[in-house]
Curated annotation (Swiss-Prot):
The presence of a 'disulfide through disulfide knot' structurally defines this protein as a knottin. The record marks 31-32 as: Reactive bond for trypsin. Disulfide bonds join 3-20, 10-24, 19-35. It holds the Pfam family Tryp_inh. The keyword Disulfide bond applies. This is Trypsin inhibitor 2. GO terms for molecular function: serine-type endopeptidase inhibitor activity. The keyword Transmembrane does not apply. Belongs to the Mirabilis serine proteinase inhibitor family. Trypsin inhibitor. Keywords: Disulfide bond, Knottin, Protease inhibitor, Serine protease inhibitor.
Length: 36
């Protein structure tokens, strides 16, 4: 599986490995999660 780059939308409930950085964090303004 390809990982998502920084700033990409990710699932807050998904595995951290979905992001290349290994961190999926809440967006400060939008009510979404993004890769750190």
């Amino acid at each position: 599986d390809k990982c998502s780059p920084s700033g990409a939308i990710c699932s807050g409930f998904g595995p951290p490995e979905q992001c290349c950085s290994g961190a999926c964090v809440p967006h400060p303004i939008l009510r979404i999660f993004v890769c750190q």
